[in-house]
Amino acid sequence: MFKKDFPYFENSDIIYLDNAATTQKPKEVVNSQIEYYEHYCSNTHRSNFGHANKATQKFENARKVLKEFINASKNEELIFTKGVSESINFIAESFAKDFKTVIISSLEHHSNIVPWHMQGRTLGAGFEVVKCDDNLSFDFAHFEELLKNNPKAFVSITHISNAFGKIHDIKTICELAHKYGAVVMIDGAQSLAHMKVDIQSIDADFFAISAHKTFGPTGVGAIYVKEKYLKDLKAYQTGGATIDQVDFEKSTLLDAPYKFEAGTQNIAGIIGFAAALEYLNHVGYENIEAIEKDVYQYLDEELRKIPDIEFYNDIEDSIGSRSFNIKGLIHDDVGILVDKMKIALRVGHHCAQPIMNQLGIKGTIRVSLAFYNDYNDVDALIVALKKAISMLK
């Protein structure tokens, strides 16, 4: 139904089921960037001629669009970055470095693990991991125990697992963390592609956002910073566009958000991100969530008909990604064969090696949906999987 809005599907006969890695881009996103490059390509926040002013206005409008999209309080609470990985690294270095303890979950992407290791944190030494149960559900009892034993910790938790699609109850996580004086960052890389996020309701202190996983351009992201923490945030990088005054003795920086956006930003990408969000507003999250829930259910039902299939969680409290293996087969081999049948999915550990190790596996076959996927895509996948299995067994 919605594939007509995405040029990729006009130019490809691939069944695209790798949306957790990146999503396709609607025409509005592509056209907004072409318009910038062809009609008013200029730098922002510097020159004062007409096209430069237009570029700055479009850039700042993108910040406003994002603010309204997630229901932030002020434009200044949104800082543009290259993506979620940079957003997490930014907060890890600029804010959370001095916290005695960082708490994450078992389901984290490497981008929410390695930055903490780079600070010298290891398991039990300033670094704690919340357990998950046999269905990959967040262990709230263990979380509360960690909070009690580590007062005023920094909590950094993914909203939706990129590897398994498991949804964490981030509102309850934030409530419990705040009860014990902790500060909370949410990795929202997978969030906005699948569900509406109301930052006021969630009450996260930081929320990391990806554009390219939300039908926007690559190389763009943002970090939401609750206003009260902006004054405590140190500049991660400095240089052009961050400066108020400079001499050879000292420098003073601008106020947020500009003090945190050093150098020329990905102007076209940020304008394109605003176009993606406006497109999603047009489609409507009621439609997006209803379509995805239906196709996700159908995917699960059809996969379960395949003999010897192994899952690691049920579909309750999950969305987007469905990970599995076939007993006796190597996931890489399956991936190679279905690729030859024009099915695009991902095999491997999905940048989540710790949870794979915990499950005693090297990786999975991952199918990840977006709202433009339909029953026909699932049917094509099932045919390809059955052929691959018959060839490998």
Regions found by a protein language model. Name each.
Residues M1-K393:
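Pyridoxal 5′-phosphate
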